[in-house]
Swiss-Prot record:
<dbReference type="GO" id="GO:0070180">
    <property type="term" value="F:large ribosomal subunit rRNA binding"/>
</dbReference>
<dbReference type="GO" id="GO:0003735">
    <property type="term" value="F:structural constituent of ribosome"/>
</dbReference>
<dbReference type="InterPro" id="IPR036853">
    <property type="entry name" value="Ribosomal_uL14_sf"/>
</dbReference>
<dbReference type="Pfam" id="PF00238">
    <property type="entry name" value="Ribosomal_L14"/>
</dbReference>
<keyword id="KW-0689">Ribosomal protein</keyword>
<dbReference type="InterPro" id="IPR019972">
    <property type="entry name" value="Ribosomal_uL14_CS"/>
</dbReference>
<dbReference type="GO" id="GO:0022625">
    <property type="term" value="C:cytosolic large ribosomal subunit"/>
</dbReference>
<dbReference type="InterPro" id="IPR000218">
    <property type="entry name" value="Ribosomal_uL14"/>
</dbReference>
<dbReference type="GO" id="GO:0006412">
    <property type="term" value="P:translation"/>
</dbReference>
<comment type="similarity">
    <text>Belongs to the universal ribosomal protein uL14 family.</text>
</comment>
<keyword id="KW-0687">Ribonucleoprotein</keyword>
<protein>
    <recommendedName>
        <fullName>Large ribosomal subunit protein uL14</fullName>
    </recommendedName>
</protein>
Length: 146
């Protein structure tokens, strides 16, 4: 009986480019906006995929990382379930490899399904260049890339 029930997890290992070294500005229990038109409004981060940290340290994420989230406000069929999301904006300032600094005015993410495909068809607001390099599908749907 227990072997038949299978939870939804990422089915395949999603191939992304190596991540840039960025300041991790989102940690567990952080609320963020959903920047796509999937029907979710507010997301809460409850975990970070591929995070290797110290014992008892809260997992943290930077733009481009995959977060495990729950929908706090949005369509009823999305709420009270575990989803995956890609973080695209953070308020915390971080340094780029060319020496410039960048920050955004909100924390935002876009929902993905368990195959790594975007749930929404549009992305509202700017997307950093680092995320556009890692996720080509996000760069094609973004309104502006900073």
């Amino acid at each position: 009986m227990a072997a038949e029930k299978k939870t939804e997890v990422l089915e395949k290992k999603i191939s992304i480019k190596p991540r840039y070294k960025m300041t991790r500005g989102i940690q567990v229990e952080t609320l963020m906006k959903c920047a796509d038109n999937s029907g979710a409004k507010i997301l809460r981060c409850i975990g970070v995929k591929r995070y290797r940290g110290r014992l008892n340290r809260l997992p943290a994420a930077a733009p481009g990382d995959i977060c495990v989230v729950s929908v706090k406000k949005g369509k009823p069929e999305l709420r009270k379930k575990v989803h995956y999301a890609i973080l695209i904006r953070q308020k915390k300032i971080w340094r780029r490899t060319d020496g410039s600094h960048i920050m955004f005015e909100d924390n935002a993410a876009v929902l993905i399904n368990n195959k790594g495909e975007l749930r929404g068809a549009q992305i509202a607001g700017p997307v950093p260049r680092e995320v556009a390099d890692m996720w080509p599908k996000i760069s094609s749907q973004a309104s502006s890339i900073n």
